[in-house]
Amino acid sequence: MATGKIVQIIGAVVDVEFPQSEVPSVYDALNVVDSKERLVLEVQQQLGGGVIRAIVMGSSDGLRRGMTVQNTGAPISVPVGTKTLGRIMNVLGDAIDERGDIGAEEVYSIHRPAPSYEEQSSATELLETGVKVIDLICPFAKGGKIGLFGGAGVGKTVNMMELINNIALQHSGLSVFAGVGERTREGNDFYHEMQEAGVVNVEQPELSKVAMVYGQMNEPPGNRLRVALTGLTMAEKFRDEGRDVLLFIDNIYRYTLAGTEVSALLGRMPSAVGYQPTLAEEMGVLQERITSTKKGSITSVQAVYVPADDLTDPSPATTFAHLDATVVLNRNIAAMGLYPAIDPLDSTSRQLDPLVVGQEHYDVARGVQATLQRYKELKDIIAILGMDELSEADKQVVARARKIERFLTQPYHVAEVFTGDPGVYVPLKETLRGFKGLLAGDYDDIPEQAFMYCGTIDDAIENAKKL
C-alpha cells in the first residue's frame, strides 16, 4: 500500500503527504510505521497537493515530522460477533482487559451506511423497566431510542446502571456498553458489577452477555469521537444475526465535545456556542444507524450531559430530535432529596398514547401530570399567602401532589451499597394500581412520609402503620 510522510502535527491532528497518485480516501485508516506501539490515523480531509489531514486515534506524543505512514486502504475495522462478549475493548477493537487477543473471525468497518427505509421496522411493544416514574410517564419501546438528560451530578449514570440491572439482567438478549469520555472509575466499577451479576463470565467468555468498549475522559479526542461508532458496529452485527440487542452509551455529549475539539484543529469555523458546524450531521450519522430492522432490534439507552442545566444548548437540543423517549433529570427534585430525580412534567415518550399503552395507563399518567402541574402553579400562592388561603379543593390537590411526588421515589438495586435500602423492581400493573388509587383519593388518610422510598402501594400502607 501507499506510504507517506508526516509534514505537520497540531495536537490531535496530523498532516501527511502522499504521492499525488496515491492519496488515501476520507475515513481510510493509516498506520504510523515507526511508532513503538500501534498508532492509527483516520483521514478527515484532503487538502490538495497530495496532503491529507487526519485525526490521531491515540496519543500524538512522540510523533515527529518525517515519520513514515502507511495507508491500509480501508476504514478502521473492529472485531464483531460472539468473541467480543465479556471483553473490554478500545476504539480500535483491541483488548484492554489483559486477557489476550479477541480472536474474532469477522471484522466490520466502523463507518457503515444506516439501514435503508425498506429494511427498518417500527415496533410498539413496551419494555418494562421496573422504575415507577419511567414506566408510568415515559414508557420505553422495545427497539426504541431513549435519552437520559441531566446536568452534572443529578444521577444519569446511576439511573443508567439501574436500567442495565433491571433490563439487561432480566432480558435474555445481548448488550453492548460504550463508555464515551466518562470516568474510568465508573467503567471499572461497571465491569466488576457485571462479573458479580454473572453477565460477564471471565472463565468462559462465550457465556457472557455484554461487550464493553471504552474511550474514557483521559483519552485523546480521536478515541472519544469514534468509540461510539465502534460500540454501535458491534451491536449492529448482533442485530443482523436476528437478535434483540441493548446498546448503552454513556455519554453522548462527550461524543459531541470530542467533535468540537477536533473541528477547530481541522480548521472549520465554529458555529453556535463554539460547537462544530457539522454538529447535526455528526449526530445524525450516529443516531440513524441505531435502529431496528426486520431482522432484529437495537434498543438504545443514551445518557446526555446537559451543560449548565440548559436543555436549549445546541448539543442536547440536537439529540432530542432523534429520541423516542426522553427522561429528564431535574436538579430541584434532587435538591429535595427525592430520587430518582426524574421530572414527570418534562419527561416525554412517543409510547404514551392510548393506542399503545391502553386508555387506563394513559389516563392515570395524564392525571398524575395534571395534579403535579396544578401544585406547581399553586406553589407561588402558598409561598406568599400560606396554605390557609387555598380552597378546600386546592388543599386536596396539594396533599395528593405531595404524596405523588414521594411515591415517585424508589430504592434502587445499584444504590443499595450507599443507601442501605434493598432495591425494588415494581411491575407496571402495581405502578398503575398505586397511582390510580392516589388520584381517586383512596389513600388520602395516609401521611405523605409513608410514601417515601417505597415500592408498591402496599409498602406505603405498611410504612403508615409504623409511623
Curated annotation (Swiss-Prot):
GO MF terms held by the record: ATP binding; ATP hydrolysis activity; proton-transporting ATP synthase activity, rotational mechanism
GO CC terms, sorted: plasma membrane; proton-transporting ATP synthase complex
Residues at which ATP binds: 150-157
InterPro entries named in the record: AAA+_ATPase (IPR003593), ATP-synt_VA_C (IPR055190), ATP_synth_F1_bsu (IPR005722), ATPase_a/bsu_AS (IPR020003), ATPase_alpha/beta_chains (IPR050053), ATPase_F1/V1/A1_a/bsu_N (IPR004100), ATPase_F1/V1/A1_a/bsu_N_sf (IPR036121), ATPase_F1/V1/A1_a/bsu_nucl-bd (IPR000194)
Superkingdom, taxonomy of origin: Bacteria
EC number: 7.1.2.2
Signal peptide, first to last residue: none
Subcellular location: Cell inner membrane
Keyword terms, alphabetized: ATP synthesis, ATP-binding, Cell inner membrane, Cell membrane, CF(1), Hydrogen ion transport, Ion transport, Membrane, Nucleotide-binding, Translocase, Transport
Entry annotated with the keyword Cytoplasm: no
UniProt topology in membrane: Peripheral membrane protein
Enzyme class: translocase
Similarity comment: Belongs to the ATPase alpha/beta chains family.
NCBIfam families found in the cross-reference section: atpD
Function: Produces ATP from ADP in the presence of a proton gradient across the membrane. The catalytic sites are hosted primarily by the beta subunits.
Protein name (database record): ATP synthase subunit beta
